[in-house]
Amino acid sequence: MKWSEVCVHTTQEAIEAVSNILHEAGASGVVIEDVEDFEMMSHREDNFGEIWDEKKRDEYPDSGVLVKAYLAESSDLTDTIKGIERDIQMLTKFGLTIGAGTVTLTQVDEEDWAHSWKQFYKPVKISRHLTVVPMWEEYTPQPDEKIIELDPGMAFGTGTHPTTVLCIQAIENYLQDNDRVVDVGTGSGVLAIAAAKLGAKDVFALDLDEVAVRSATDNVALNKVSQQVTVRQGDLMKELKEPVELIVANILAEVILLFVNDAYELTLPGGHFIASGIIGQKKEMVRDAMVAAGFTIVETTKLEDWVAIIAKREA
């Protein structure tokens, strides 16, 4: 079988939206190539992140990012590519900057694809105690290190996007043993898995997307946390009946605004709401909405162009 590599040249801001477009077109996973990752890792003072092969620096664009996906060649591939191009251009109507927004196509042999794509994925230390490891990698954790295994070939990626990293680090800082947690827009389920690994008693992982629900369910089983994590298909927080100690949402800023009042009502007094997926220039908009809902902002963290906002419902 022949495969085609679809490569989209876009911006950091549009990575998640472009990735979703590629998933909807039939891709089972995406590869993100961002030269700023090299720059960030070379200047970090902590030991978080992946070990990078500097020889690959010249393969990355000087500006913007490349989002790559692989589609099986078929008679309707031309129409599929036209649909991808159209949907990417439509993102500008939602206020996203897409940069070049170009789509290129390269043919790849199945044998080459079956082996070469795994080279992009290595263990990544996300926080003090959590490391994301591709399921095929042999990895021996340190005594205080917990492992999240993911299949990067599945939909919703690797769990190492800056917004995910910010969320996981905030969960590690604010989660208390035996807390109940809600993960809104769970995607791969990585935040729900992280909460379970860090001591949550019960975790409810919600997503409207059927593919996300399947992906999260598989990842929860892979990480052996099915007793703690319940994955449900649902519209934002409408499935919830009882308040919890911690709500997390790695989701677009505009979507956070839709349920921030519900988040306040479903956060126990003294509990926290962690919101990420927020591009820097939309930070104040989300902060203002959280405060208007009744939350107190306790911390804002930043990684690359993204921020996470941690808010508290006062006791």
UniProtKB/Swiss-Prot annotation:
Q: Where is the signal peptide?
A: none
Binding-site residues, S-adenosyl-L-methionine: 164, 185, 207, 250
Keywords for this protein: Cytoplasm, Methyltransferase, S-adenosyl-L-methionine, Transferase
Q: Which gene name does the record give?
A: prmA
Task: Kindly provide the name given to this protein in its UniProt entry.
Answer: Ribosomal protein L11 methyltransferase
Q: Where in the cell is it found?
A: Cytoplasm
Listed under GO biological process in this entry are: methylation
EC identifiers of the protein: 2.1.1.-
Q: Which reaction does it catalyse?
A: L-lysyl-[protein] + 3 S-adenosyl-L-methionine = N(6),N(6),N(6)-trimethyl-L-lysyl-[protein] + 3 S-adenosyl-L-homocysteine + 3 H(+)
**Origin organism of this chain?**
Exiguobacterium sibiricum (strain DSM 17290 / CCUG 55495 / CIP 109462 / JCM 13490 / 255-15)
Question: Which HAMAP family does this entry report, sorted A to Z?
Answer: Methyltr_PrmA
Origin: domain of life = Bacteria
- Which InterPro entries is this protein grouped with? Ribosomal_L11_MeTrfase_PrmA (IPR050078), Ribosomal_PrmA_MeTrfase (IPR004498), SAM-dependent_MTases_sf (IPR029063)
What do the Gene Ontology cellular component annotations say?
A: cytoplasm
Gene Ontology MF: a single term: protein-lysine N-methyltransferase activity
Cross-referenced CDD domains = AdoMet_MTases
Pfam families in the record, alphabetically? PrmA
Tell me its family. Belongs to the methyltransferase superfamily. PrmA family.
Task of the protein: Methylates ribosomal protein L11.
Top EC class for this record: transferase
